[in-house]
């Protein structure tokens, strides 16, 4: 299991947990909108570090953004497997072609 798969499994396991026992459970208990807001904040922080060129800070913020992306998706019952399947369906297709077909 990759670290991303492990993270997704942990997030999934926390969906029914007591919000007092887990940051993930607490975030999920606040609903999809709050999860989306938090993802947006973390994405902006990653963008800032990318612009600044701080590799270590970008790596850290990217990890935070990935975590919050998975939490946001879990809040809407979209799993990492769902995302991987979507990516697999796009494999071998030019990005320009894929975008034109939307």
Swiss-Prot record:
It catalyses: 1-(5-phospho-beta-D-ribosyl)-ATP + H2O = 1-(5-phospho-beta-D-ribosyl)-5'-AMP + diphosphate + H(+). SUPFAM superfamilies: all-alpha NTP pyrophosphatases (SSF101386). InterPro entries: HisE, PRib-ATP_PPHydrolase-like. It is found in: Cytoplasm. Pathway: Amino-acid biosynthesis; L-histidine biosynthesis; L-histidine from 5-phospho-alpha-D-ribose 1-diphosphate: step 2/9. GO terms for molecular function: ATP binding; phosphoribosyl-ATP diphosphatase activity. It comes from the Bacteria. GO terms for biological process: L-histidine biosynthetic process. Keywords: Amino-acid biosynthesis, ATP-binding, Cytoplasm, Histidine biosynthesis, Hydrolase, Nucleotide-binding. It holds the Pfam family PRA-PH. Its main location: cytoplasm. It is an enzyme of class 3 (hydrolase). Its EC number is 3.6.1.31. One of its GO terms (cellular component) is cytoplasm. Belongs to the PRA-PH family. HAMAP family: HisE. This is Phosphoribosyl-ATP pyrophosphatase. It comes from Jannaschia sp. (strain CCS1).
């Amino acid at each position: 299991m990759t670290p991303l798969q492990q993270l997704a499994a942990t997030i999934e396991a926390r969906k029914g947990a007591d919000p007092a026992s887990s940051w993930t459970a607490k975030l999920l208990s606040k609903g999809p909108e709050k999860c989306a807001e938090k993802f947006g904040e973390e994405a902006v922080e990653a963008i800032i570090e990318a612009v600044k060129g701080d590799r270590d800070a970008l790596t850290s913020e990217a990890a935070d953004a990935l975590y919050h992306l998975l939490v946001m998706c879990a809040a809407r019952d979209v799993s990492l497997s769902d995302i991987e399947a979507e990516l697999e369906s796009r494999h071998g297709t030019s990005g320009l072609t894929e975008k034109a077909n939307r």
